């Protein structure tokens, strides 16, 4: 089967670039519990969603969730990159792909993390839900990242660890891969899939 020719590759942040796919359940809620937060998990998830849509600042989020004592830099220390992601990004950049990230995230945290790990050296285009008030899988989010990449959906590959987001991308005409599935759960496996199925335009 001939390889598909693409111009852009768009990666999700949590669960693809970063190791933890459920950052709320795996990182945020435990962090807040350690700070004495008494809210239910459901209430924390609601506050996070509001913050990820740009309706709350992180200062407002921390006050609502647990009062003084929690802050952005402290929380973001718990995140780590997926093993092998930087070498793969460097290879994709060198191959001439236009790289972007489409993520449902809090703006301040997204900025802190990409600066901490030096991701903008490889991924210059970011659509963060809090910055635009739009979360995946809404079609407008995908339209925004394609616009930033200056290419049409049919020339873009989208990689995400959530099935609903992958399906939404496909409905818009994008190529899409569901990361985290058997045979596609490491950067080496993603590299191999990219080599077998895609080539730069």
PLM feature segments, named:
Residues 28-37, 47-50, 72-83:
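Helical cap/lid subdomains and adjacent loops of hydrolase enzymes that gate the active-site channel
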Residues 12-15, 54, 101, 126, ...:
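Generic structural signal for small/hydrophobic residues in well-ordered secondary structure
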Residues 20-21, 84, 105:
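Acidic donor-diphosphate engagement hotspot in glycosyltransferases and nucleotidyltransferases
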Residues 45-73:
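A metal-dependent, Asp-based hydrolase signature
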Residues 72-100, 139:
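Short, acidic loop-to-helix structural element flanking the phosphoryl-transfer center
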Residues 1-9, 90, 106-107, 111-201:
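Asp-based, Mg2+/Mn2+-dependent phosphohydrolase catalytic module
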Residues 2-46, 171-172:
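Active-site neighborhood of HAD-like aspartate-dependent phosphohydrolases
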């Amino acid at each position: 089967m001939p390889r598909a020719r693409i111009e852009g590759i768009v990666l999700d942040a949590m669960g693809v670039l970063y190791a933890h796919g459920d950052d709320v359940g795996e990182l945020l809620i435990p962090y807040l519990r350690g700070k004495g937060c008494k809210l239910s998990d459901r209430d924390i998830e609601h506050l996070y969603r509001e913050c990820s849509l740009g309706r709350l600042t992180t200062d407002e989020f921390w006050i609502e969730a647990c009062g003084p004592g929690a802050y952005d830099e402290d929380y973001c220390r718990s995140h780590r990159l997926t093993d092998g992601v930087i070498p793969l990004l460097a290879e994709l950049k060198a191959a001439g792909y236009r790289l972007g990230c489409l993520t449902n995230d809090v703006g301040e945290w997204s900025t802190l993390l990409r600066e901490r790990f030096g991701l903008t050296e490889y991924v210059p285009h970011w659509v963060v839900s809090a910055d635009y008030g739009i979360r995946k899988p809404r079609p407008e989010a995908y339209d925004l990242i394609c616009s930033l990449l200056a290419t049409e959906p049919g020339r873009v590959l989208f990689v995400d660890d959530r099935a609903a987001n992958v399906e939404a991308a496909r409905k818009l005409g994008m190529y899409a891969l569901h990361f985290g599935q058997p045979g596609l759960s490491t950067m080496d496996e993603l590299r191999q899939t990219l080599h077998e199925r895609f080539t730069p335009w």
